[in-house]
Amino acid sequence: MVAYAIKTPPQHGTWPEILDLWRAADDIDVFESAWTMDHFYPLVPPLDGTELESWTMLAALAQATRRLRLGCMVNGMHLRHPAVTANMAATLDHIAGGRFQLGLGAGWFQPEADAYGIPLGTLTERFDRFDEGVEVIVSLLTRTRTTFAGRYYRITDARCEPKPVQDRIPIVIGGRGPRRTLRTVARWADHWDMTRPEDTGEWTRLDAVLREHCAAIGRDPAEIRRSVHLWWATDDDPAALADTAAGLAAAGVDLVVFSMRAPYDARRLEPLAAALAA
């Protein structure tokens, strides 16, 4: 059965309105999870606007909610050393009481990286670094000790303690690249997220590619949850959004994420929830 989630990118938003909306969503059973995003600069105009930092905010939102699973779609691998990310994830899972989900991506936003002097690299470098980083994170979160020697990351007899509350924090990998991203999804992910497909057919085609990658390594593709992002504009008709979500569910999508834009108004949640439950 399809599930539903909300996403509140912190660009141009204020802490009080995001907090209010998440608390309201926590009381609406239709929404199983809530998400933010990991950037320091807004992606939509005005580009010189504000952007709250995602991990700091998630720790506070974990304390402010009791039921929603929560995470960030997705965290850029280039922004933090994967050993740091692993420790942050384990700690956040304790704060959330086992509700955290770890979203990971290769990174892409060049203006932000240039402004902060954070190396982003070529596409090949990004995905090579991403593959290494995911392996480091998964190992640190699940094994007693980790030694890894790659091109981008080297760790020696490293520990990450305490381990998460969950036996395994779900690893969410976002993207649509058929050759590299979906191959990494097949190898490491518990959950694949795709943002705004052009239509259901595009998602179906990429899902077939993911299944091929799974077959190549002997993994059951049913082990991987699938989600899709939809924009949720202020003037969107909830019934139309529900119809779109139903079409995605029929195609095999497990979770539909409704991504909002600031200003955030908690009063928008109930009409959408009613349409989804109808």
Describe each model-derived feature in a short phrase.
Residues 1-278:
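Active-site-adjacent structural elements that line small-molecule/cofactor binding pockets in enzymes
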